[in-house]
Amino acid sequence: MHTTQKDTTYTKIFVGGLPYHTTDASLRKYFEVFGDIEEAVVITDRQTGKSRGYGFVTMADRAAAERACKDPNPIIDGRKANVNLAYLGAKPRIMQPGFAFGVQQLHPALIQRPFGIPAHYVYPQAFVQPGVVIPHVQPTAAAASTTPYIDYTGAAYAQYSAAAAAAAAAAAYDQYPYAASPAAAGYVTTGGYSYAVQQPITAAAPGTAAAAAAAAAAAAAFGQYQPQQLQTDRMQ
């Protein structure tokens, strides 16, 4: 006669994490409180006969197996074990909260910004050495404070020189009170030289002999003065 094998899918329980001194009898004794037991066996090594630390318990019905698996980590023979239906496989142990290790989360403000000079501090250029990290400066502020010194070279110096020369010429011109004449308008008067003061010419009616004579006298008087040659060493 062929015996029909009973389906133990929902009644056979895997018990892991057993101490080495647990036997079939002690395993059965623990699960008897949940219902009738058909089989309780501890798996041992064939050569040494010692327990391998796990076993199987077959309950009589599915309800008893569910009651036995309600606590997934029971204490069997003084050691915490793990219990689950055999077809589901071994169930990992639940770690105690006191033994759980985690990685502490860091605040985003502590990891986003690299170490260096804070952005809200501004250091003068005279104290910053090459290679030191300099915080970002707005383009408008950088254009206004690129250097602590005033630029006296290039166009700025040429403008300053022209203004100084004009002021010096005006001061020298005030020291020599003579009437301006059309012939001397193109020449620059410099200090250190004296000129004869021209007497004012009496105005005469145009087209008369007196007017022609006055014009000839003025031409003769100004013809005696040659244009002054500027020396190169005074222009430096």
From Swiss-Prot:
Domain annotation RRM: ranges: 11-88
Broad class of the protein's primary localization: nucleus
Record localization: Nucleus; Cytoplasm
Tissue expression from the record: Expressed strongly in heart and skeletal muscles. Weakly expressed in intestine, aorta, liver, lung, kidney, uterus and bladder.
GO biological process: 3'-UTR-mediated mRNA destabilization; cell differentiation; DNA damage response; endocardial cushion development; mRNA destabilization; mRNA processing; mRNA stabilization; negative regulation of cytoplasmic translation
Molecular function (Gene Ontology), one example: mRNA CDS binding
Keywords, sorted A to Z: Cytoplasm, Differentiation, mRNA processing, mRNA splicing, Nucleus, RNA-binding, Translation regulation
A single GO cellular-component term on record: cytoplasm
Induction section of the entry: Up-regulated during embryonic stem cell (ESC) differentiation into cardiomyocytes. Down-regulated by microRNA-222 (miR-222) in skeletal muscle cells, leading in inhibition of muscle-specific pre-mRNA alternative splicing events and myoblast fusion.
Gene inactivation effect: Mice die in utero between embryonic days 12.5 and 14.5. Show multiple cardiac malformations, including defective endocardial cushion morphogenesis, ventricular septum defects, reduced trabeculation and compaction and dilated atria. Display loss of sarcomeres in cardiomyocytes. Show aberrant pre-mRNA alternative splicing of key genes necessary for sarcomere formation and cardiogenesis.
Matching InterPro entries: Nucleotide-bd_a/b_plait_sf, RBD_domain_sf, RNA-binding_reg, RRM_dom
Region described as Necessary for interaction with EIF4E: spans on this chain: 175-199
PANTHER family linked: GEO13361P1-RELATED (PTHR48024), RNA-BINDING PROTEIN 24 (PTHR48024:SF10)
Assembly: Interacts with EIF4E; this interaction prevents EIF4E from binding to p53/TP53 mRNA and inhibits the assembly of translation initiation complex.
Domain notes: The RRM domain is necessary for mRNA stability and mRNA translation regulation.
Functional note: Multifunctional RNA-binding protein involved in the regulation of pre-mRNA splicing, mRNA stability and mRNA translation important for cell fate decision and differentiation. Plays a major role in pre-mRNA alternative splicing regulation. Mediates preferentially muscle-specific exon inclusion in numerous mRNAs important for striated cardiac and skeletal muscle cell differentiation. Binds to intronic splicing enhancer (ISE) composed of stretches of GU-rich motifs localized in flanking intron of exon that will be included by alternative splicing.
Protein name as it appears in the record: RNA-binding protein 24
